Amino acid sequence: TGIIKGKVVEKGTYKVMLKAENALGTDTQELLINIGDELLLTPPMGWNSWNTFGRHLTEELLLQTADAMVENGMRDLGYAYINIDDFWQLPERGADGHIQIDKTKFPRGIKYVADYLHERGFKLGIYSDAADKTCGGVCGSYGYEEIDARDFASWGVDLLKYDYCNAPAGRVEAMERYEKMGRALRATDRSIVFSICEWGQREPWKWAKKVGGHLWRVSGDIGDLWNRSTDEKGGLRGILNILEINAPLSEYARPGGWNDPDMLVVGIGGKSKSIGYESEGCTNEQYQSHFALWCMMASPLLCGNDVRQMNDSTLQILLNKDLIAINQDPLGIQAERAIRADHYDVWVKPLSDGSKAIACLNRISGPVDVELNVKTVEGLSLDRVYDVIEGSLVAEASTGWIVKLAPGECKVFICK
């Protein structure tokens, strides 16, 4: 099946030789399995129900999504998490103290969904809130952290997204509430990734790791938008808005703890039931830039579109193996902006093999030319330059070259 299952008793790094054979020949690859206390050594990849479906999530939707991600190749490229967002539970907690699953949406329960996903090589994420009620007004986990954490573990949950609606505004109170749930998750017999979602209002990059977090939102909710001011239509932020928020936070990203600039909006195309607000969405070029920038920033890659029905352009963006490899590079370094010009940016991300990923972004509505050479980017080697989007080598780049960018376009190169 290609799915490796099992348990390891002792910590350590284990080497496994994998062999593949078909009519074209045979190949081997060494797989390193790191076993230790730290989770999420690379940014999580997967899918979340919120951006397209909002409150309209069901068991059937989750299972169909998993099947689609197997068929279209997403699972095999690392999109492992399938995350249930708000509205899986009833408004009121049960008399026995447990959260009640909405059986009209999940008639066979959450464990059934988890088992279905695990059998196919996926992991299950779930959602709750550090208050009595979630953002949608259904049952939250405040005061019942241990009970809920045990339930999540017994169902087979692998990730908890923990929101902060209807909770105290202060940083100290937020840290206390997140620390309590983080401690409850660690007390279970299951490794559960803890996703902290308080929208960056209390600088979680400075404390989230201390309370057990593995990723933390740095901004308000993303919209299916390229750029907009926050006072429009619910305060949703555009892709460029969030890019600016996350840009100065690179020092806080590392294996086991990631800045989270929110989920991907690639391919939504204005069809969201939760974040679209009748938006027409972005162009394919803007979606391509969005994905490239999130890969450069070592961001979580959690898709929010309907993966059951994607056009070729969306699929091509999300299945770019080279961009995914940049995102999943084991060094875990978030790209830093090397050049901020009037109309364009140049971003640099060191990679584990000694090469560098270079991203050139056009921020304006007209074309831009960017000159790249050893003088414009310090320490840049141009012996071999690979165009990640086009999937080809750049000819005659040893002394530098001109990168031509269409409006909103981002091109990425690997330079050795």
Where are the model-predicted features located?
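Strand-loop-strand motifs at the edges of beta-sheets in extracellular beta-sandwich domains
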Residues: 1-9
